[in-house]
From Swiss-Prot:
This is N-(5'-phosphoribosyl)anthranilate isomerase. The keyword Ribosomal protein does not apply. SUPFAM superfamilies: Ribulose-phoshate binding barrel (SSF51366). One of its GO terms (molecular function) is phosphoribosylanthranilate isomerase activity. Belongs to the TrpF family.
Length: 217
C-alpha cells in the first residue's frame, strides 16, 4: 500500500483530521519563508498529542545541520526532509537527529545519476521528487510530467524509496499512484482551503483515492 504524507500541518485540528483519515505521516514546515511555517514549539505541542504509529517529518530549507538537529530533537521528529541544493552529501550526513529524506527537483538538467551518487556518498535511501520551478525549493503545486516520473521512480527502485510530490490532489493522485508506483505520495496545497489551513474533506478524498489506486495495480 502506498504511504501517504500530508504536509504543511500548522494546527492540531488538521493534524488529527489527517491521522483519522488514514495518513501515515505529517509534515511540519520550518522554513520561515513558507506560508505554512510553524514554530518548533508549536509543532511539538501538536506532535505530543498525535495517535501512535504516525511518522512526523520536518521540512527544512535554510537551516544548517546543527539547527536541523536541534529542531529534530526538540520536536521528536522521525524524519528530516532536506530541500535545496545547500544540503550537499557532507551536510546531509551531519544531520543525525532524524532519518533524512533528500528532496530532488526534476529540472531540465536532472538525471537519476545525481540521486545514485548522493546515495552512494551518504547511505541515505529516501528521496522525494518534486516538480521544478525557478526560485522555489518545493511546494510548487506543479505536477511532474508523467513519463519523466515513471522513468525516475522505475530507476529509483534500485537505489531506495521514492516519494512523489508536486501538484497531487484528490482528482489526480489515484492515476499518478497507479502509473508511477511510488513508495509514498506527498501533498500540501492539494488538500488546502488556503496555505496552512486544510480542507478535511479533501484530506479524506485524497486518502481514499490513494487506497483506491491499489485496486488498479
Amino acid at each position: 500500500m502506498t504511504k501517504i504524507k500530508i504536509c504543511g500541518i500548522t494546527n492540531p485540528d488538521d493534524a488529527i483530521a489527517s491521522c483519522t483519515a488514514g495518513a501515515d505521516a505529517l509534515g511540519f514546515n520550518f522554513s520561515k519563508a513558507s506560508p505554512r511555517y510553524i514554530q518548533p514549539e508549536t509543532a511539538l505541542s501538536i506532535i505530543e498529542k498525535l495517535p501512535p504509529f504516525i511518522s512526523c517529518v520536518g521540512v527544512f530549507v535554510e537551516q544548517e545541520p546543527h539547527e536541523v538537529n536541534q529542531i529534530c530533537n526538540l520536536c521528536r521528529l522521525d524524519h528530516a526532509q532536506l530541500h535545496a541544493e545547500r544540503y550537499t552529501a557532507e551536510k546531509a550526513v551531519a544531520v543525525r537527529g532524524a532519518k533524512v529524506i533528500r528532496v530532488f527537483r526534476t529540472g531540465p538538467d536532472f538525471t537519476i545519476d545525481v540521486v545514485r551518487t548522493f546515495a552512494e556518498e551518504t547511505g541515505i535511501t529516501s528521496f522525494l521528487f518534486d516538480a521544478y520551478r525557478p526560485g522555489q525549493p518545493g511546494g510548487t503545486g506543479h505536477v511532474i510530467e508523467q513519463q519523466l516520473a515513471q522513468k525516475i521512480f522505475r530507476e529509483t527502485e534500485h537505489i531506495g524509496f521514492g516519494i512523489l510530490a508536486g501538484g497531487l490532489k484528490p482528482e489526480n493522485v489515484a492515476e499518478a499512484t497507479s502509473t508511477v508506483r511510488p513508495y509514498a505520495v506527498d501533498t500540501a496545497s492539494g488538500v488546502e482551503e488556503s496555505p496552512g489551513r486544510k480542507n478535511h474533506q479533501k484530506i479524506r478524498d485524497f486518502v481514499s483515492a490513494v487506497h483506491r489506486s491499489a485496486e488498479l495495480l
